[in-house]
Regions:
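S-adenosylmethionine
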Residues: 1-455
């Protein structure tokens, strides 16, 4: 791979030489292909055709030996699985750690995925969270928000709200009718970034990279987190992630959030065999001293039988060549304040309020008009009769072609299914049937042989 100008020198100023050399070598490797199954759709023993092992930090994740034409598989459109990069599935391990650790005692009633499109992390969150926990999946970009709504509808869980709004507008909407009535218990901020972790997959990530672009992204990330901070309750959890390697967008931003907004970093236990790295900076030996006492505290309060083999990282780096996945970074912070306090004083620090006044993206300040809620119930007709389709019929349905339903099919709205998984709706008129699959979701790509990953 031809790396951007200044890439090597930029990282050598910040990382050890051997770590830079390993990163450059890893970026020359081939990216892996991975999917994550929907536990509400497929049984635990389900394994895709061409599976090449499970993703170690996410039991629902599988590597594939090669990349099939996913569009030609009806089960993808039915929400039976999601094509997701393996490193980003680390969110599953983090959320399970948060929910099941005796230390956090998180009452998970409302969760926000702030920058959620196209939906990989939101679908993962929805699979892990309690059914009575409300998930708000947000995307500020209108086109990407439509894709997010489609994927959440297909994943098939009723307790989801998809919104299109900026972070500041969401913070202002807390308490408004029809939205969250209280600050969020957990916020995932998978913030826009310079995209270093996607360089093996996307030429644009290579072309756009520069030290100045990294600095711009780091500033934007701080602004986004500052804007959403009032929407996180005192004692609530922020999961911060990027698909980058550099310390400006990663370690330094997390430390800035902790220092300026008021939070503590939470070390995450990881298996050494996973290959996940911690703080990558040259001076990390000094920085590690800051976390040593905190790390011991969490070990004592959350003892596990195999704790001696676990590494606790306040920063989690996924580096190509060292993990089987693309570049990714994640850290967890807990907002200062009592978990019982949800008052405005707990929710907003003076520094956060000062930054909010400087923000130019407020518009007219009307949160209700600035926040758009997108429908996710377009497939909801659970009481309708079900009609099973063949593989070829399922693809034709997904292309919005006309189908002839069996003669015994009841008239009216029916659910059409493939392998027992609902694809969508049709209206049977007797002599013909109207295809009600949403036009904007239809398969537009050229011909591909229909297939499915799950027999």
């Amino acid at each position: 791979m031809q790396l951007p100008k200044d890439f090597d020198s930029y990282f050598r100023e910040r990382w050890r030489d051997e770590d830079v050399a390993a990163l450059v070598a890893g970026l020359d490797g081939e990216p892996s292909v991975s999917i994550r199954v929907n536990p509400k759709r497929l049984p635990p023993e389900a394994e895709p055709e061409g599976a090449d092992g499970r993703v170690p930090w996410c039991p629902e994740g599988f590597y594939l030996k090669q990349r099939p034409v996913f569009t030609a598989d009806p089960l993808l459109h039915a929400g039976a699985y999601y094509v997701q990069e393996a490193s980003s599935m680390f969110l599953a391990h983090v959320v399970r750690t948060i929910l099941h650790s005796s230390f956090f005692t998180l009452r998970c009633q409302t969760v926000l995925d702030l920058c959620a499109a196209p939906g990989g992390k939101s679908t993962l969150l929805r699979s892990l969270l309690p059914d009575d926990c409300r998930l708000v999946s947000n995307e500020p970009n209108r086109v990407r928000a439509q894709v997010l709504a489609e994927n959440m509808a297909k994943w098939g869980h009723p307790n989801v709200v998809v919104t299109q709004a900026y972070a500041a507008d969401i913070a202002h909407a807390i308490g408004k009718a029809g939205f969250a009535q209280r600050p969020f218990d957990l916020i995932l901020a998978d913030v826009p970034c310079s995209g270093e972790g996607m360089m093996r997959k996307e030429a644009e990530a290579v072309a756009q990279w520069s030290p100045s672009f990294v600095a711009e992204c780091a500033a934007l990330q701080r602004s986004i987190v500052s804007d959403i901070w009032p929407a996180l309750r005192a004692g609530g959890i922020l999961i911060y992630s990027t698909c980058t390697f550099n310390p400006e967008e990663d370690e330094e931003n997390v430390e800035w959030i902790a220092r300026e907004l008021g939070a503590e970093m939470i070390p995450i236990p990881v298996e050494p065999s996973w290959g996940i790295r911690g703080d990558m900076r040259k001076e990390r030996e000094i920085e590690d001293i800051k976390y040593k006492i905190q790390d011991i505290k969490y070990k004592i309060q959350d003892i596990r039988a195999h704790q001696s083999s676990i590494i606790n990282h306040p920063f989690c780096h996924f580096l190509p060549g060292q993990v089987r996945g693309e570049g990714f970074f994640m850290a967890v912070l807990r907002k200062h304040g009592s978990e019982e306090g949800d008052s405005e004083d707990d929710a907003e620090s003076p520094k956060a309020l000062k930054r909010k006044k400087k923000d130019k993206r407020k518009g007219n300040g009307d949160a209700a008009s600035a926040l758009t809620v997108l429908p996710t119930d377009v497939l909801d007709e659970t009481g309708a009769p079900r009609v099973e389709l063949s593989l070829e019929e399922a693809i034709r349905y997904l292309q919005r072609e006309a189908l002839v339903l069996p003669a015994e099919t009841p008239r009216g709205i029916v659910q059409v299914c493939f392998r027992g998984q609902r694809l969508g709706l049709m209206k049977n008129l007797g002599t013909r049937a109207n295809n009600l699959y949403p036009k904007e979701w239809r398969i537009r790509s050229g011909y591909a042989i229909p297939h499915t990953l799950f027999a």
